[in-house]
Amino acid sequence: MLMPKKVKYRKQMKGRMTGTPQRGVELAFGDFGLQATECGWLDSRQIEAARIAMTRYIKRGGKIWIRIFPDKPLTSKPAETRMGKGKGSPDSWVCVIKPGRILYEMEGVTEEVAREAFRLAAHKLPVASKFITRTEINEG
């Protein structure tokens, strides 16, 4: 699973999922990409599940880049614990996703293969996303 090696602070505030991303909105490596169209949190398990779905479909052809990283700790309190007594301990890691953020990139395969691989990956993710190509970005 993806997680930071070391963090400055063990726990973080929840925050608000508003606005648009400042970076990570254009294809940087591949010819095709999966772009988020709504905001949400992606768990490290969900990121990995989508990656596995894509790699299994494209088999040995092509290259995949993961453009997101879970760097926000989620805390949880143990089951059957009374309220109060402070914030819970870090439980899992999430990545904050805003609309327009590129999640994955791919190259070395045809557009049909890439489109189907990203469709399979999108089913594993809790945020709505769309398929984009490098030519669409250059034209628009």
Curated annotation (Swiss-Prot):
Keywords: Ribonucleoprotein, Ribosomal protein, RNA-binding, rRNA-binding, tRNA-binding. Pfam families: Ribosomal_L16. One of its GO terms (biological process) is translation. It comes from the Bacteria. InterPro entries: Ribosomal_uL16, Ribosomal_uL16_bact-type, Ribosomal_uL16_CS, Ribosomal_uL16_dom, Ribosomal_uL16_sf. GO terms for cellular component: cytosolic large ribosomal subunit. One of its GO terms (molecular function) is structural constituent of ribosome. PROSITE patterns: RIBOSOMAL_L16_1, RIBOSOMAL_L16_2. Belongs to the universal ribosomal protein uL16 family. Part of the 50S ribosomal subunit. Binds 23S rRNA and is also seen to make contacts with the A and possibly P site tRNAs. This is Large ribosomal subunit protein uL16. The lineage of its organism: Bacteria, Pseudomonadati, Thermodesulfobacteriota, Desulfuromonadia, Geobacterales. The gene is rplP.
